[in-house]
Amino acid sequence: MASKGAGMSFSRKSYRLTSDAEKSRVTGIVQEKLLNDYLNRIFSSSEHAPPAATSRKPLNFQNLPEHLDQLLQVDNEEEESQGQVEGRLGPSTVVLDHTGGFEGLLLVDDDLLGVIGHSNFGTIRSTTCVYKGKWLYEVLISSQGLMQIGWCTISCRFNQEEGVGDTHNSYAYDGNRVRKWNVTTTNYGKAWAAGDIVSCLIDLDDGTLSFCLNGVSLGTAFENLSRGLGMAYFPAISLSFKESVAFNFGSRPLRYPVAGYRPLQDPPSADLVRAQRLLGCFRAVLSVELDPVEGRLLDKESSKWRLRGQPTVLLTLAHIFHHFAPLLRKVYLVEAVLMSFLLGIVEKGTPTQAQSVVHQVLDLLWLFMEDYEVQDCLKQLMMSLLRLYRFSPIVPDLGLQIHYLRLTIAILRHEKSRKFLLSNVLFDVLRSVVFFYIKSPLRVEEAGLQELIPTTWWPHCSSREGKESTEMKEETAEERLRRRAYERGCQRLRKRIEVVEELQVQILKLLLDNKDDNGGEASRYIFLTKFRKFLQENASGRGNMPMLCPPEYMVCFLHRLISALRYYWDEYKASNPHASFSEEAYIPPQVFYNGKVDYFDLQRLGGLLSHLRKTLKDDLASKANIVIDPLELQSTAMDDLDEDEEPAPAMAQRPMQALAVGGPLPLPRPGWLSSPTLGRANRFLSTAAVSLMTPRRPLSTSEKVKVRTLSVEQRTREDIEGSHWNEGLLLGRPPEEPEQPLTENSLLEVLDGAVMMYNLSVHQQLGKMVGVSDDVNEYAMALRDTEDKLRRCPKRRKDILAELTKSQKVFSEKLDHLSRRLAWVHATVYSQEKMLDIYWLLRVCLRTIEHGDRTGSLFAFMPEFYLSVAINSYSALKNYFGPVHSMEELPGYEETLTRLAAILAKHFADARIVGTDIRDSLMQALASYVCYPHSLRAVERIPEEQRIAMVRNLLAPYEQRPWAQTNWILVRLWRGCGFGYRYTRLPHLLKTKLEDANLPSLQKPCPSTLLQQHMADLLQQGPDVAPSFLNSVLNQLNWAFSEFIGMIQEIQQAAERLERNFVDSRQLKVCATCFDLSVSLLRVLEMTITLVPEIFLDWTRPTSEMLLRRLAQLLNQVLNRVTAERNLFDRVVTLRLPGLESVDHYPILVAVTGILVQLLVRGPASEREQATSVLLADPCFQLRSICYLLGQPEPPAPGTALPAPDRKRFSLQSYADYISADELAQVEQMLAHLTSASAQAAAASLPTSEEDLCPICYAHPISAVFQPCGHKSCKACINQHLMNNKDCFFCKTTIVSVEDWEKGANTSTTSSAA
């Protein structure tokens, strides 16, 4: 192996030591006196060297081995103890007892030190116990859930409900609930968080037991422990499902040693002394330089020392590493000796100096150690470094994290070490994503935030979507000063965090370097393979928590990756003018169908990939010149047939881990083990990716490219970046795409992975972290409420004043804590830079979707998550980053809103998208989009043909599709224009609960007259659009209201039973949903009648009369059910059941009233008469229902004024804040008109014999006869029937025509059955 140093390379074989005492003199060695001085300087530098090591005999390379042996001799008292130590029983190497010392199901790491709970409350103990003396061990907390950590005896018996501390002679500390346990429980200690270290101490001389958290003593927890014959205590833990920790019994240096206490596992004392002496010699080499010309030794700074190929220096180092190399493979020595040495270099020198020394050290390791030795050393070094970074406390200047990251960067700058770590360690063995995470402090006082942010402040209102912001009082001078002081503190914190983030970005820049391909594959392409596997594990294991990267890590990883990605993207643009800037980035559509990037089993827009390859193979050939290998299609078909049989061989290929279970379970080893650093070595099975069978000449447009499947590991740089005749990832460019590449193909794959990361867990975590801001708002509201009560409380009530003062103090202290923690969250998660990253990702997705849409049918190959990320990232920008940062301040905000609106409008009903979930997401996003003025205006800005196409899709018949969301969209376009439909909170709730701040709230109305006009134009076009749409709306209204009535009957029956009954909350929710659907359907009918009244009132249209009669029938049914005296509806409303808050008279009656007023008051006289006659002709019509609207029990006598309404009754007049005076006047006019018309109709009506009534409805006289069968009914019944069915009611004969029929008439008029 070769190593680089001072521009020269040296072969390790030339300087291998030999045992031959008679070897010849090596040429190039300096003269004897200088050699003696040099060797004495190097090997006498150890402070602990025994006298024998410094003899008067001149030192040379012949007697140096003997001298080294004497130097490394260790006194007898420092030798490791191989037998039993007094006070301890068990193996000298302490691990978890996975063979018999456990209860429940647990997953144990390969090193038998990390454990994950895999059952309700599993327990496990160690293999070694203690009965005398003072002992301790450390537990690294990987998750902050329910765990009980401590000690137990071998006689303790545990189960799935009782763990450590729940039995006699077992003692535990629980930082989740902040308690100590020994059969009973009391408060103790502090709350722990992920990243903390708990030290468990037991003093069996005094019989006491205590705990420390991050080196700070929590005090004595238990006294008077049972001691004596047969009493020995084991370290033990009980943990709930998915919780994880790692133990350190002494196999590594303790992070927080305690004087007088001994770790359960003895350190390798003798080897530690030898390693420290050898390190002293090594440091001496780096500080001395030979001057053979002058014959003297020169002192040299380590950062300026260079290996110049001098044989004397090389042989000296070879002797040192002959003894040092085996020691550097041991975990304890790497962390205690090598890590401390390297950290000292980083802490004392500048970054440049530290980098120089670390680079020299790594060069020497690779030169003088065997490959397997240096690889083990580097692996242990990175594991220790990661552990130190993750479990370091947060200090105000983040100095510890900065030092660990600087050392990581220095190591990764060494090309050979970087490639080895990237290929074998970073993603395979380590949780390397931890390096990009900045943990949030649970205890702000320990993190120094009180000094950094001495003044606290919190906003007084919420600006999140869906929450009505309260009127903000004018800011006082004192509040303004507090806010500005708080913002200055936040700025100081943000600057310190930015230093750490920049170091993390530097790490990723090193991993994404593609210019280090001398003698091997460049780092970027190794990273791509590992990164894709990382994504596969997290995508395929979403239900298996141990296999997932924690979402808080993923958020930080995504932001650092975007920064590094954009750096390289713009760097490539600087040297390639034809490429694009990162601001114009997108993923070309051919990446989704050429198979060069593996999307695992993620759903495509058009369904499964195997299905798309079969159904769209002709389109692939014609548009992209791609032919799928027939063998590929055949193997895919066989995979589909054998899908149920796949898991067995897949699991057989995975290595088993140590399982702490009662019997053998065929569990695959989890990918993210509980250890802070250990992961799975062999995580993945082979995954498929399609690669070119590379042609050797340019392709003509008529030639096709046949593709075949390769595993991810088999891809080469050429498969990704392409070559002269190979487009790599961009194989199969459609004609719509430009010929010039956007950037390097490898960066496109990284960008694709970043989008996938956001979809996997980042969005979910962004929503979760908003909880801190919500807590601040809730406590601020509680504090204001308490202060108001203090001001109103009489001074004589000192007891109440004392309680209120106490509450005020508690709320103030909690707000101080939360406001500082919120500052940390805003700096690490919701800063302006993070917001720009998410915004950039949104724009990338929008451009990707737009380019994919242009490919026609090939758009179906796009993974669903691109649409999901576009929807969710917009939601995050709008809801999660305020009020500190506003989306409206982002560059190109209006244009982005419009582009997203165009995508939602076009694709919510796109036939190329088949997935139910993604179609629902698109529909819900569009429904949310039209609720808010800014986004609704964006919908109105999209091209007119797209707007019309969107409305046409909304007006499609409701059958055979999810219609509820469509209906909500139409309602939101209307809200603010309907009768009494301008409220933001349900008026009937405000009348009963004036001060309830938790009432359901709605957005302020923002109707769209433009989209309403498109709807009117479309309903007037063609003879079938309006009838089919309205018929489906009437059908759904009939269903929804009937279901609602049936459910409230069941609720009423349950409430009237003598025994105590609880109505199922799910049933109440469904009932309320049916009511809300009924109201929304009525509002859509109101909008339709208002915009296009002729659809119902122009009887020259063949379906108008039928639609009007159906409408009148349903309106009468609703009115009769809701307005009857002491009826079912009244009784259920009076119950005020939780979950039925929206069910009341007002919402449904004003919707019905709006329709009736439009039909009977606002239209021309002729149309009003038609509507009146149809309404009165319906047998269910009752004038009393119309009187009910104005609070009148009976209709008034003709010519008399309306009496004052009864306050106990429902009346629209009681809602003057929501119903205008003009609207009330129209209702009164409608009542007067119907009173007069019903009286005239009653006087003019003639009795009808039963034989002449329609045999279907028994409400109207027979007026139509069917041909050819001759059966009869009224026109309303047969017209409604023919909308859905062409068979006769009675004989099932196909109806050819319907003829008018009148008793006694000799002629008839024929009309078409259609």
Curated annotation (Swiss-Prot):
Q: Where does Zn(2+) 1 bind?
A: C1254, C1257, C1274, C1277
Annotated organism of origin: Homo sapiens (Human)
Subunit structure of this chain's protein: Component of the KPC complex composed of RNF123/KPC1 and UBAC1/KPC2. Interacts with UBAC1 and CDKN1B via its N-terminal domain. Interacts with RIGI (via N-terminus) and IFIH1 (via N-terminus).
- Write out the PTM section of this UniProt entry: Ubiquitinated, leading to its degradation. Deubiquitinated by USP19, thereby stimulating CDKN1B ubiquitin-dependent degradation.
Q: Does the keyword Hydrolase apply?
A: no
- Any extra detail in the entry? RNF123-mediated maturation of NFKB1 restricts tumor growth by promoting activation of the NF-kappa-B complex, leading to expression of tumor suppressor genes. Activation of NF-kappa-B promotes tumor suppression via CD274/PD-L1 and chemokines-mediated mechanisms.
| List of residues binding Zn(2+) 2 | C1269, H1271, C1288, C1291
Renumbered to this chain, region (Interaction with NFKB1) spans 968-974
One annotated GO molecular function: ubiquitin-protein transferase activity
What is the biotechnology note for this entry, i.e. how is it used? The WILVRLW sequence, which specifically recognizes and binds NFKB1 could be used to generate a tumor-suppressive PROTA.
Q: List residues, modification Asymmetric dimethylarginine.
A: R683
What domain of life is recorded for the organism?
Eukaryota
One CC-aspect GO term: nuclear membrane
Report the protein name in the record: E3 ubiquitin-protein ligase RNF123
Keyword Membrane included in the entry's annotation: no
Please give the residue positions where the record annotates the modification Phosphoserine.
S675
State which gene encodes it: RNF123
Q: Where are the zinc fingers (RING-type)?
A: 1254-1292
